[in-house]
């Protein structure tokens, strides 16, 4: 008979930061009696989830991928943004073998170099400085046909901020003497991660056939027309940009296609549509035979050259629990499932021995402000059942609402999202109390605590660099101040009586009073 476990649950409230300013702060204005009570009764502090503390550049806002890698690995992990920016500064980028091979193969075949990615200074999925470096490198190596397929942001940046980026790249190509922007489309279509293939197909058809809803002779003109249609950057319809002769640039046999996003989760679907022989997400009218390169590693099943392969993380929390014969559960909705599994495990797809996973489907709505509670009730039903089963030593759960609804910029919906999560936490804490379990409540980064950009007055749809909550609901304890996300895994190991491996550089934040 299996011994009953007293589970330790880590509840990650995605996009839930702490902000002193209460103006347009959805978390402050939400009615959250459960969290208010827990903060009053139990030890708590604030920890850092941004900038240098998570391996990002100083001042750079945190994000879900980075947050979960730090949470699960127990160390500050040098992030792809920093790593690639450093390679550019050190002039190593222009010698990268995978990128050089792609450019050279296209030149040799008389083809074009196509560069696609999120044209954004947001630094969450990509950075436009990296895209600029790629354009410069391609021309420097002798490419005369360089085409940029720009995915527009408006989510990790202000909703209407793409104009300066597009203007900059128009000027860049003029300076370089070669290349141009070939198409623009909102990330809503090109970077879907929830198997909404009808969206992805529009980006695929745009790049491979020039098939678009609109056609313009200039990218800025195309963007301004989208604004006239009331489309913010994220939702810009497929727009092909013609050259002086009225021609569109499409991906052909012998061309190279370089995907400049460094974050994996929203890069996987469109990548598979380009390279998987047995792809069945939608009907592909053409499948060009081209040289495809990914900037980083997107998934184990994606077989393409990688410019910057993942660094192997040893002795993450999941791996240590496996080695000690512990059981663990990972649970979230579709939107954050990859984060509590792949990213939390340091970029490993396969579950560890003793690791169960539960995926709850996120609601099929256009944007989550239409259903701010998302699937939190069903998620909590499954989580409570898992706690009551007493099967697990450690449970990792992510509630996506604060982030996913925060990204819509809809203040009232974000308030409702926070209230829904608070009610769920109450159920989880009650279930843990019945079985003698404990929980840590924290977040991966901020978002919902700032719903308006104080400078522009526009909706603030991006993450923030605010500190995030850290609450321990359990035994009588003290909590150290000044912690960061990488301290969470060592804290969990200490609470369950396991040794912290040398690879974990984080420090335990919770100290039980004997």
Curated annotation (Swiss-Prot):
Cofactor(s) demanded: Mn(2+)
GO biological process, one term: glycolytic process
UniProt keyword list: Glycolysis, Isomerase, Manganese, Metal-binding
One family name in Pfam for this protein: iPGM_N
Cofactor note: Binds 2 manganese ions per subunit.
GO cellular component, one term: cytosol
Matching InterPro entries: Alkaline_phosphatase_core_sf (IPR017850), BPG-indep_PGM_N (IPR011258), Metalloenzyme (IPR006124), PGAM_B_sf (IPR036646), Pgm_bpd_ind (IPR005995)
Binding site for Mn(2+) 1: 403, 407, 463
Sequence positions that bind substrate: 125, 155-156, 187, 193, 263-266, 336
Positions contributing to Mn(2+) 2 binding: 14, 64, 444-445
Reaction equations catalysed: (2R)-2-phosphoglycerate = (2R)-3-phosphoglycerate
Active site, renumbered: 64
GO molecular function: manganese ion binding; phosphoglycerate mutase activity
NCBIfam families in the cross-refs: pgm_bpd_ind, PRK05434.1-5
Family affiliation: Belongs to the BPG-independent phosphoglycerate mutase family.
Subunit relationships: Monomer.
Official protein name in the record: 2,3-bisphosphoglycerate-independent phosphoglycerate mutase
Protein species of origin: Shewanella baltica (strain OS155 / ATCC BAA-1091)
